[in-house]
Amino acid sequence: MMLLMVMTMTVNAQPKKYLGGDISMLPSYQEKGTVYRDDEGKAVELLPWLKQQGWNMIRVRLFVEPENAPQANKDEGVCQDLNYVIGLCQQIKKAGMQVMLDFHYSDTWADPAKQFTPKRWKECSPQAMTDSVYAYTRASLIALKKAGVTPELIQVGNEITNGMLWPTGKLDPSKAEGFNTLCQFLKAGCKACREVCPLSQIIIHTEKAGDWDITRNYYQQLRNRQVDYDIIGLSYYPMWHKSIPNLGQTIKNLSRLFPEKPIMIVETAAYYSHENDPWAKEDTYAEFYPISVEGQRQFTVELMEELRKHQNVTGVFWWFPEENASGSEVTKGWLNRGLFDNHTGRAMPAFYEFRW
């Protein structure tokens, strides 16, 4: 009996493993009548089917006022305002899954190359911008909570290694300068999260998994300034962030230096084609995997094998898995990194390898 109790306690102590993806474009595909299919060609209702396949968390991005985004960005899928996000989160919760909310703090894409300040905050002083981050985060979360869709995980910023809310919050992540302003913004966002959603966990998301020195310095600077968050979130794409063993070493190092912080791969994906892809250009990684259906599958196999080695890794999320141009196109051009074939709508072989 004692042995059984010890075994039960050990099992219960294991961190929950999250599996999911950022499917922020799903309502746009639904409006077009897009049909998703399993690998045998059977039509499925996507969210309930993902739940059946073992997914338990869906990531959703939120822009401040996406109507202010350039048309080119809208053509790429920038449309997720608060009302859109609430509707999608209601679908996710109805399907029995949890929500990760991804605050971009921008009217358009926020990533390493750009962290544009929302139009309404452009003339703000650093302190006024800090106050705006707090008020906006708080108001957004209150609206989600009132709609019955409190997010279980909350990202305060998206791929913010180079800072956020440029130019005010821009920084060089290899140096200490600039982190005071960034951390002022982060603390404001995290404070709002704690107040409105005290049971939710907060993620700080960076995208330099292939560069240990920058990753180490970044999270050390946050620790030095006592930023209150729970989870280290990383992007990992093989075309930009070196090999999977390199990712594994970064995870080991983070687990050693920040043992109190679980780690999640909050974005990952790999190409299966460059067909009709206006963005690909030099995004090749033939040194690791061929750009093919089999290459995408093999990447997924090896990624999951690596992540299973690390107890401190508690989640992995595919970015834009719902891409499916088999009916009507939603974006101008195909990214070809999703988990459904753009011609047939069938689940890709990689989908069935993407599991714990």
Which residue stretches match the model-derived regions?
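Boundary/entry segment of secreted carbohydrate-active catalytic domains
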Residues: Q14-W49
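Hydrophobic faces of well-ordered beta-strands that scaffold small-molecule active sites
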Residues: L19-I23, I58-V60, V99-F103, E152-V156, ...
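Acidic-and-aromatic substrate-binding clefts and catalytic sites of carbohydrate-active enzymes
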Residues: Y29-Q30, T34-G41, E65-A69, D75-N83, ...
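Aromatic-rich peripheral "rim/lid" segments of glycoside hydrolase catalytic domains that contact
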Residues: E31, N253-E260, S273-W356
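Glycoside hydrolase catalytic-domain groove-lining segments
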Residues: E40, V44-L47, N180, K191, ...
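Substrate-binding cleft and catalytic face of glycoside hydrolase catalytic domains
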Residues: W49-Q201, H205-A209
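Structural recognition of alpha->loop->beta junctions
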Residues: Q127, Y134, I142-E152, L222-G233, ...
